[in-house]
Amino acid sequence: MLFRSGQKKRENRQAVFLAETPFGHAEGSSLRIRLKHQSQHAQHQFGRVRLAVTSSGAYTEKEIPLKLEDWYSLGPFPTEGLSQNHGPEGAPIDLQQAFPSGGKVLKWAKETKYVDGQVHNLSIGDNTSLYLYRSIQSQSSRRVSLSLGSDDAIKVWLNQAQVMVNDVNRGVAADQDQAVLDLKPGANHLLMKVVNYGGASGFY
């Protein structure tokens, strides 16, 4: 992965290359970098170059954004309340897994219509639960804040650990709840459950 800064005229340029996998060992490592300069103007010069290797997480924390994978939904399930577990809670998420419910078999479905930062209607019916899942890819360990909204109740897990719960009856709006996510390097698994006690339903 490459991050670049310094795009203005007469401004120093900086490029940061992030390795996809860790490298290096106690006996030493050899790193080869090839640089090529191309310009349509003959007077352009490559300039001075300084190379350095670092294990600092400063760039990944400040400059490299998180990668948010697609949303998936599971349900709706007839429910007795927010505490009722319909299968995926507290366990590794398997998007191929099927869940029996009321004589039917429910499976995870990709939801390409969900856009972050917007309120989405779920239309799941009275006294039902719906699960929402996505993977969050992080280059490093970092803490982020998650803003949520729901109609009605909501519960959130990260990597199988519960991080937020609000058993409430309300209409959905932006920024009704906040959760803190302690992300680890690599894939992080975010699971949410929305319970509709009656009327409209949705999430933010």
How would you label these PLM feature ranges?
Residues 31-36, 144-148, 188-194:
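Extracellular beta-strand-rich recognition modules
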Residues 138, 142-157, 190:
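Aromatic-lined ligand-binding clefts that engage carbohydrates, nucleic acids, or primary amines
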Residues 13, 155-204:
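Beta-strand-rich ligand-recognition modules
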Residues 17-27, 132-144, 180-185:
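Extracellular and analogous surface-interaction loops
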Residues 1, 46-48, 54-120, 135, ...:
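Accessory carbohydrate-binding/adhesion or oligomerization-edge regions at the termini
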Residues 4-13, 120-130, 167-172:
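Extracellular beta-rich ligand/substrate-recognition surface
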Residues 1-62:
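Subset of Sec-pathway N-terminal targeting signals
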Residues 30, 46-48, 143, 153-155, ...:
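Exposed beta-strand and adjacent loop surfaces of beta-rich binding modules
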